[in-house]
């Protein structure tokens, strides 16, 4: 039955993406190509994160969630995420990765992923693990 719950399916994919991101972070110093890989892993992880939030909110009866900004705001209001400003900064970084490529910007985003965003993803994973365990 749990396999039919969309947010849990999405959460499983989020975990896989987060594990991939962790490999880049654990590596430490990255080559230019690896740094580009970290940005891609961040993009995938971010997309799966906000979509997991959206799916969970819809599963819980919430509506009017049209994009990541709505999902983040509502997720913060309901305690799914604790650092709303951090998630909004992450949204801004995600938008920058898809609309521009600039080495300095990429370096700044890589630094933010390692020092800030990865921790936010870990907290989100912990929250959804708790919610998933409460369901069983």
For the regions a protein language model found, what residue spans apply to each?
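Solvent-exposed interaction patches of small proteins and small membrane subunits
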Residues: 1-136
